[in-house]
């Protein structure tokens, strides 16, 4: 996803970021950043907080841009990509591409599950996200928890699937996957 973010920034913001690939994961990228092998990286802020919280706390890194519809509470002064994009058409295409970040890693059930069972599963999930033991374990592991309810995730999916064809085509152009 980092290379995708960089490619879209280069296309929409006229940045000239040179992408360096070959790092096996975010830990290797962060190590390369600390060693001065690379000048930056595009990765989840929560990953930095989990793997190298000292980098942000010691102000050894600066977060330049956020992806998504809402700013992280730790980063109120860091702009969203959508705030920097000039046209409404491109903002809509960026939303189609990056709304998945708001969902995180959703849980799904197969098509055809009765509505009352879906409601039960959603209620159980919501309750589990409030479990003090789970929250304590997440904090212990320095994991950020920002659960979204099933209705919210469903609304995001519905919005994506109702995107106008023109917006989807522009998103494909930005991704380099035009038909």
Over which residues does each language-model region extend?
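Ligand-binding pocket segment of bilobal, Venus flytrap-like solute-binding proteins
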Residues: 1-83
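Charged, low-complexity, helix-prone segments enriched in Lys/Glu/Asp/Gln
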Residues: 41, 98-103, 159-167
